[in-house]
Amino acid sequence: MSEINKQWLGLPLNLLWGYLAIAVFMTGDGFELAFLSHYIKSLGFTPAEASFAFTLYGLAAALSAWISGVVAEIITPQKTMLIGFVLWCVFHVLFLVFGLGQANYALMLLFYGIRGLAYPLFLYAFIVVIIHNVRSDKSSSALGWYWAVYSVGIGVAGSYIPSFTIPHIGEMGTLWLALAFCLAGGV
């Protein structure tokens, strides 16, 4: 059996590290879902302002999701993932230091919005990697695994870990820890 055809319960073993990277990266990206809106309000912003930050992030992510496949086809999925990873890390730091750290709403929107453009470049370019490396008759299970590791990262670990970290290192410490997870997933 060739290396490209080896699977475990439909998981393409030749892409195992990519799947793990998605799970770890999305864990870090998902930390904020559990508390960021409340934290923004605790900085003195209104519920409407906190909601608008998430709306802007969602719009940026939707736009980036739309173009990520095209970009991956033009410059390769690996380069697209690298660009998304670097942008996410840089703009996460800027968001923490100058947006949240200074309670500057304009910079919060700018940096969080640009960060919203970044994660789909990293995340959805991996779908192109799957398509390029998995036989078409095996793609359904390979994509099922993709969505499973994505969901475990963002929805399970990313939402659960802050329940342990916030009492010990606070919201900002937890957001800095998110960077460590994304660095581990992106490298």
Regions from the PLM with identified roles:
Residues A23, Y105-L121:
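Hydrophobic core of transmembrane alpha-helices in multi-pass small-molecule transporters
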Residues V86-Q102:
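C-terminal ends and interior cores of transmembrane alpha-helices
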Residues L121-V134:
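Intracellular juxtamembrane helix-capping segments at the cytosolic ends
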Residues W8-G58:
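Helix-loop boundary and gating motifs at the non-cytosolic
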Residues G173-V187:
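Symmetry-related core transmembrane helices of the 12-TM Major Facilitator Superfamily/SLC fold
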Residues G58-W66, G155-V156:
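Residue-level signature of mid-helix packing/kink "hotspots" within the transmembrane helices
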Residues S64-T76, I166:
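Helix-to-loop junctions at the C-terminal end of transmembrane segments
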